[in-house]
UniProtKB/Swiss-Prot annotation:
It is found in: Plastid, Chloroplast. HAMAP family: Ribosomal_uS2_B (MF_00291_B). Transmembrane segments: none annotated. It comes from Chloranthus spicatus. One of its GO terms (molecular function) is structural constituent of ribosome. Belongs to the universal ribosomal protein uS2 family. GO terms for biological process: translation. Keywords: Chloroplast, Plastid, Ribonucleoprotein, Ribosomal protein. This is Small ribosomal subunit protein uS2c. Pfam families: Ribosomal_S2.
Amino acid sequence: MTRRYWNINLEEMMEAGVHFGHGTRKWNPRMAPYISAKRKGIHITNLTRTARFLSEACDLVFDAASSGKHFLIVGTKNKAADSVASAAIRARCHYVNKKWLGGMSTNWSTTETRLQKFRDLRAEQKMGRLNRLPKRDAAMLKRQLSRLQTYLGGIKYMTGLPDIVIIVDQQEEYTALRECVTLGIPTICLIDTNCDPDLADISIPANDDAIASIRLILNKLVSAICEGRSGYIRNR
């Protein structure tokens, strides 16, 4: 893996609240090596370790992007959804930011069928064919299209399983993480002090509840993806 400098600044992470964990009663003992202190009933994450694992994750995604690999970013809770979408769009990654439909990756054939239906309905709408149908039929198909856009809009260009999955909030996206583990898809996961650091391939200890923290971590990762991808495009 190529080791590069990613300008990961401890002061910047502190300003974003990356170091704030959960209450000391809500913690996973396996997170002990990643916790540096307790303050007012809250665990404080060791930002030196955060920087180390974030740098490793940036190296991984840079190398993957340099060889044309595809990424999926998953984060469906309200505080993460907008940051996930904007980061993914910036780096031209696929994303899921509303709801992970069970079996989305492990039952890929069903997902492919849904995606094809989504593409067909989008094409019908663009050509104005839905408006030529009886009102009841048109309304039903438009509702179906709206639902597909909500849940599959971020993966509408996916033609196969991703090469690497980036997950915001291990507990919230546990189903997605387990599916990736089952399929052997490498994962990078933001983990708060209530998570299990051993589940993902690279776990980044960080506050997964603060928007600023989520945005900072994602921005570092997608910057590495963009840099790697630009090199891939130049060398093609």
